[in-house]
């Protein structure tokens, strides 16, 4: 079944896999999900991701990151901000800080998908996709 919100689907799959302490999770591969996975990897929230499958049925296998003996998830929470029914945009001066800089906001800008920190540094605003902490 086709999903209307691939970003929300990706965040939910990561959240559910984290709660169940799964080592990996699989999400449909799109340009947007690849970019978000790359940002999560660069920020240290996930170990790695790779594409599997062929042709139309491409998936991303995301390797989740845990810490300590109790395997506490590195990602405490994921929150979808801009949704298909209500888009949320922010200019460069109003980019949100997540938990005073502890978390990140993932922003879709004209320069690509990046964190709020990178967008502030580049002086661009855009659509606030989600918060991760």
From Swiss-Prot:
The protein's name in its UniProt record: Small ribosomal subunit protein uS8
Assembly notes: Part of the 30S ribosomal subunit. Contacts proteins S5 and S12.
Gene3D superfamilies in the record: 3.30.1370.30, 3.30.1490.10
PROSITE patterns tied to this protein: RIBOSOMAL_S8
Main function: One of the primary rRNA binding proteins, it binds directly to 16S rRNA central domain where it helps coordinate assembly of the platform of the 30S subunit.
A Pfam family that the UniProt record links to this protein: Ribosomal_S8
Keyword Zinc-finger applies: no
GO annotation, biological process: translation
Highest taxon above the source species: Bacteria
Protein keywords: Ribonucleoprotein, Ribosomal protein, RNA-binding, rRNA-binding
Keyword flag Ribosomal protein: yes
Family under the similarity heading: Belongs to the universal ribosomal protein uS8 family.
Any one cellular-component term (Gene Ontology): ribonucleoprotein complex
Gene Ontology molecular functions: rRNA binding; structural constituent of ribosome
Natural source organism: Cyanothece sp. (strain PCC 7425 / ATCC 29141)
């Amino acid at each position: 079944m086709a999903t209307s919100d691939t970003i929300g689907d990706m965040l939910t799959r990561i959240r559910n896999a984290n709660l169940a302490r799964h080592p990996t999770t699989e999400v449909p591969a799109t340009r947007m999900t690849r970019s978000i996975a790359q940002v999560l990897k660069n920020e240290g929230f996930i170990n790695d991701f790779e594409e599997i499958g062929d042709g139309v049925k491409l998936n991303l296998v995301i390797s989740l990151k845990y810490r300590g003996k109790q395997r506490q998830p590195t990602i405490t929470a994921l929150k979808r901000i801009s949704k298909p029914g209500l888009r949320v945009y922010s200019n460069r001066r109003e980019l949100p800080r997540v938990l005073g800089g502890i978390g990140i906001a993932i922003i879709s800008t004209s320069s690509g998908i990046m964190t709020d920190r990178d967008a502030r540094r580049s002086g661009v605003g855009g659509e606030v996709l989600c918060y991760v902490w």
